[in-house]
């Protein structure tokens, strides 16, 4: 099912959200968002390729490095892309000034996007703008582009508040071997679009039930590192669980996991008067099962008159994540071990489901995971079991 995203303007001091697409991939993503009616967001495109930029549909377009590149592109050289952005720092600053939140979108691995993205992010942060990058990573068979992309990502991480990475390798896994190149890249553009539209909807659509505002988004996304955004839609019996599972298990975001999330935003949308408290509890319980014990969680509930009474849409934004393969450098640590005989009792506290359980602590080493007596006495958290098994 396709959605037309209508990010309604708030009546009182609406947050100003801008999206800047950099290079060929970023500019294509901007065109896709414009074509899909993502509204109440200001679009900016910036490129060193004058011919490509002239065909872009963004209201604001910036020719980067006119003197340096003569409008002929960066030649897949990120140093050229970086220098081109530095040449036009003033134009970039003027274009993004006044934003409360800036999305940077690009395809990493090329010249313009990889080189200019850290520069744009640094300018945005100097202006006090909440800065989120949503980028793609090249296919693993692309050789040099992979290394260029990784170096660019490391630089980008230093300046953005949150970073959402979409690995192109996952396109083949998610869409099948028979997918065409056009379909694959359209899918990547759609993930970029959904991330921007979903977060923007949370920020700018007021709710009369439980409202999420820009301050909530800033709390969860500021200085958080790796992030993910997912959305799910379901109808009928068990709709809350199905939509939540969809939202947290996007195959195109498979390089990160919700396990250990430090910040989460959850937005639940139904037809007027159709959200049950039991569904709210179920959604938050699923989220909290995978997240960090010190999770900063905010949730909102909104109503959409265009939705059917048996439908639910759930948007989840999780931050402070680790990429798969990242491990805690400390070999031995203290974790909560939960006695399974205690009865769990859940309640809502400050917009978040918290679980009260009888607990005690113990130090676990790697060997304890193979000791059946330890496993029998304690319920080892799933995140630790999975991490241990993957390290074998």
Swiss-Prot record:
GO terms for biological process: division septum assembly; FtsZ-dependent cytokinesis; protein polymerization. Keywords: Cell cycle, Cell division, Cytoplasm, GTP-binding, Nucleotide-binding, Septation. GTP binds at residues 24-28, 111-113, 142, 145, 189. The keyword Oxidoreductase does not apply. It comes from the Bacteria. Essential cell division protein that forms a contractile ring structure (Z ring) at the future cell division site. The regulation of the ring assembly controls the timing and the location of cell division. One of the functions of the FtsZ ring is to recruit other cell division proteins to the septum to produce a new cell wall between the dividing cells. Binds GTP and shows GTPase activity. This is Cell division protein FtsZ. The lineage of its organism: Bacteria, Pseudomonadati, Pseudomonadota, Betaproteobacteria, Neisseriales. The gene is ftsZ.
């Amino acid at each position: 099912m396709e959605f037309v995203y209508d990010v309604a303007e708030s009546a009182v001091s609406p947050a100003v959200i801008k999206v800047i697409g950099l290079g060929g991939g970023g500019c294509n993503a901007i065109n896709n968002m414009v074509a899909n009616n993502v509204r109440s967001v200001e679009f900016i495109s910036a490129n060193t390729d004058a011919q490509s930029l002239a065909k872009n549909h963004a209201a604001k377009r910036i020719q980067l490095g006119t003197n340096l590149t003569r409008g002929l592109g960066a030649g897949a050289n990120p140093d050229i892309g970086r220098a081109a952005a530095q040449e036009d720092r003033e134009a970039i600053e003027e274009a993004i000034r006044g934003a409360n939140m800036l999305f940077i979108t690009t395809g990493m691995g090329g010249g313009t996007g990889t080189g200019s993205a850290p520069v744009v992010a640094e300018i945005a942060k100097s202006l006090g703008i909440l800065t989120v990058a949503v980028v793609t990573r090249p296919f693993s068979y692309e050789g040099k582009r992979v290394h260029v992309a990784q170096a660019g990502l490391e630089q980008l991480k230093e300046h953005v508040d949150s970073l959402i990475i979409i690995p192109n390798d996952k396109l083949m896994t998610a869409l099948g071997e028979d997918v065409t190149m056009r379909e694959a890249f359209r899918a990547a553009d759609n993930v970029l679009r959904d991330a921007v539209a979903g977060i923007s909807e949370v920020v700018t659509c007021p709710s009369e039930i439980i409202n999420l505002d820009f301050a909530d988004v800033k709390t969860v996304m500021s200085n958080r590192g790796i992030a993910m955004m997912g959305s799910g839609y379901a109808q009928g019996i068990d709709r809350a669980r199905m939509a939540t599972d969809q939202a947290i298990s996007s195959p195109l975001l498979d390089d990160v996991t919700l396990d250990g999330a430090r910040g989460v935003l959850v937005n639940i949308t139904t037809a007027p008067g159709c959200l049950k408290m039991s569904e709210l509890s179920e959604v938050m319980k699923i989220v909290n099962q995978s997240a960090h014990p010190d999770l900063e969680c905010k949730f909102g509930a909104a109503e959409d008159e265009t939705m059917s009474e048996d439908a639910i849409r759930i948007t989840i934004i999780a931050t402070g994540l680790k990429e798969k393969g990242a491990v805690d450098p400390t070999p031995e640590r203290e974790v909560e071990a939960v006695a399974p005989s205690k009865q769990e009792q859940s309640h809502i506290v400050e917009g978040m489901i918290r679980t009260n359980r009888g607990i005690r602590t113990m130090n676990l080493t790697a060997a304890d995971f193979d000791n059946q007596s330890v496993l029998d006495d304690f319920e080892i958290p799933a995140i630790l079991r999975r991490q241990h098994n993957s390290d074998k």
